[in-house]
Amino acid sequence: MKCPFCSHPDTQVVETREAEDGGFIRRRRQCGGCDKRFTTYERPEVSFPAIVKKDGRRIEYERAKLLGSFKIALRKRPVSTEQIDAAIERIEERLRNLGEREVLSSRLGEMVMRELKLLDKVGYIRYASVYRSFEDVDDFKNVMDEVRNPG
């Protein structure tokens, strides 16, 4: 691996550690040219199914888009970044476990709603209002009743 400081092509791994959750490997490297040390992270490459939009277009799954949706729904709510990341990890695990090459955007939206309902009811209602295209106050009332009286 090339040194990020001097671009020397020869670096040596001086320490390797696996993350607590086993999701990645942390390596400390030392440059053979300038002797500076730097850290790299190695994680397995994972492919996700393509997302099929309502109009039939197929787009690549983008974690950043999902994160953006969570952040909008949970803006100014008492939900930590760690909680959001954990919710996204659960969704990504479900997507991987589907074993399918494509997934409907509506199915992904339902996964997001399930996670938001567990994290924060207000965030859930905010997301539902856009996702389900609320048109009037009755739509909000119906979802609020659903949140108050699950089952």
From Swiss-Prot:
Example GO biological process: negative regulation of DNA-templated transcription
Superkingdom assignment: Bacteria
Keyword Glycosyltransferase: no
Entry keyword set: ATP-binding, DNA-binding, Metal-binding, Nucleotide-binding, Repressor, Transcription, Transcription regulation, Zinc, Zinc-finger
Domain annotation ATP-cone: ranges: 49-139
Signal peptide positions on this chain: none
One GO MF term attached to the UniProt entry: ATP binding
Zinc finger (unnamed): 3-34
Cofactor(s) named in the record: Zn(2+)
Cofactor note: Binds 1 zinc ion.
Protein family according to the UniProt entry: Belongs to the NrdR family.
Function statement: Negatively regulates transcription of bacterial ribonucleotide reductase nrd genes and operons by binding to NrdR-boxes.
Name listed for the protein in its UniProt record: Transcriptional repressor NrdR
Organism encoding this protein: Delftia acidovorans (strain DSM 14801 / SPH-1)
Gene this chain is encoded by: nrdR
